[in-house]
Amino acid sequence: MTPTVSNPFSDPFIDQLRAQRQNVIELTSGRRLALPASVGFCHGVRHAVQLLADTVAAAQQQDIWLLGAMIHNPAVNDYFVKQGVKMLDDHDLDTVFTRAKATDIFVIPAFGLDCELDERLRAFVQSPGQIVDSTCPFVRRVWQAVEQAATTGAAIVIHGKPGHQETTGIWTRAAKVAPAVAIVPSPAAAHQLLDALPPTTPGAAYPPAWLVNADRLPHCDWMLVNQTTMLCSETEEIATILANAGSKHHGAFTMANTLCNATRARQAEAEKLCAQTCEVILVLGGINSSNTTQLYRLAAKHTTTYYLQSPDDLDSHAVRHYLPNEQQWRDSSHWLPPPPATIGILVGASCPDSEIAALIRKLQACA
C-alpha cells in the first residue's frame, strides 16, 4: 500500500535533530540532554502505523477493527481510537466474530496474532483484501524459523515474555508444528528448565503453562528463537546455557538468527549512552512495551533512572515513574540534578516523535 497520508506522529524538531545528527542539546540552565543516535519508531512500527493511518483515510463507511493494541504506546492507540478505529482488548479478541460484519476491515497489529485466531479471521472475512496485516517482518522471520526447525523434528525454545502478544503468536505456531515447546523468559529460567528435565521428573518445578510435551524435550534437538524485543545479550546468554548442557538434556542445539536488527542496534546505543556520565536517565515509552522495559533495565544498572509513559509524568519538582519489576507507579521529588548535569534520554521503538519532542520541550522549559 502506497502511503496516502502523512505520518500523524512526526515532529519537525525531531526531524531536524536527525538531519543534523544532533545527540546533545544544551539547556540555558547549564544542564544538557544526551540522546542516542536512533530515536522514534523502528521500521516495523513505522510501517504498521502508516498502514493503519492509510487504512483509516481510505475506509468508506466501513468499520475498522484493530485486533489488540497496534503497538504498546497509549498515545498512538488513543489517536486511532479517536479516529473511529474499534480497538479490541487482548482478552476480547474472540468477540470480533460476533460483533463485526464479514464485510468490515480488520487490522492485525505489529505483533501478529495467535495462530488459531489468525486462521479464524481469514476464514471469516468475505474477501482477503479486508485484512490489513501489519505484522512486523522480523516477527514473521521468527515464525519462519519455527516452521523450518519443526520440519527437522526439533523442539522449539522461545526466549520471550509469557503472555506477550508476540510470544503468544510464536508459541501457538510452534505448538502446532513442533514436537515440544518451552518458553524461557530469562537466563535463570533456562537453568530451571534444565534442572526440571531427566534424570529428574520431566516438567517438575517448571511452570506447566510454559511447556508443551515436556516429556519429549530430552529426545529432541533444540532450536532457540526469541521474541524480537527481548534483551539480545540475554538471548545469547540463554543460548550459551542451553548449548553447554549438551547431550545430557537434549540433542543438538542451534540458535536461530531471529534477533531484531533494530532492537540490537538500539540496545547497543543505549549501552553507549549509559557509559557516559549521566546523572539521571529518563526512559520514555509505554509501560507495556517490552523493548522500552529492556532499555530501562539497561539504564538502571548505571545510574538513577525514571521510566515515563508520557511527558506529562514529569515537571521540575517531581516525576511520576513506573517500576517494571514491582509493576507499580511511584512519585519522586527533587529528581532534577543541579547544573552542569547531563540528563540522558532513552526512547522505546514504539514511542512517536511527537512524544519525544514534547518531553524535550518540557525539559527545555523546566530543566
List the predicted regions and their residue ranges.
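The feature marks the mature, well-folded catalytic cores of soluble enzymes
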Residues: M1-A367
